[in-house]
Amino acid sequence: VRRTETEPIKSITPLDTGDTPMLPATEQWINIRNLGAKGDGFSDDTHIFQEAVQKYANIYIPQGWYVVKEPLTLKQNTNLIGLHPGTTILLSLGGNPAFSGFGAPQAQLTTPQGGKNIVCGIFLNADAYNYRAVNCKWMAGEGSYMYDVKFSGHDKARFFHNGQSAANPLEKPMSITPETHDLITRAWDNQHWSLWITNGGGGS
């Protein structure tokens, strides 16, 4: 029999957070569903999100497909905290007037210049057929943090196994063929960059 000698740990070195801001306590979060958001991939949740940003600092977004038809601009201290970028989706359906047509780039999500925002755990999906769309315009500065965020793009995972578009899980299923994938790919080529860092944007 082999014996192992162990000693109890006398102390633990405190976690060095460095430049990475910590999430606020969960008691300070407001659940977007409790404010009336549906997250069903069909209902328009735009105004629910806009009002939440005006009233609350820490907005929790559980899993769901949240249709946002207009640009969403955060305040200086707004934090968007999603459950998981694979299941928490902010999406703009294809052909949305706010993001399609011709003109300057238009961001789904914008952080203010010098903001101290935290954005995490979400999937920003602008759809391939919104040609002016940018997923995120990031101008937040020191003390801000973006992590675990997914952007829509050249990704076959855009489709479910039954052919439904990830931009709208309720639409009529589309047969998956080389031709349909080619159409999507060419549509993405017309779109702007996904992450637009400008005006001194930075953070962690």
Positions of the model-derived regions?
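Leucine-rich repeat
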Residues: 128-132
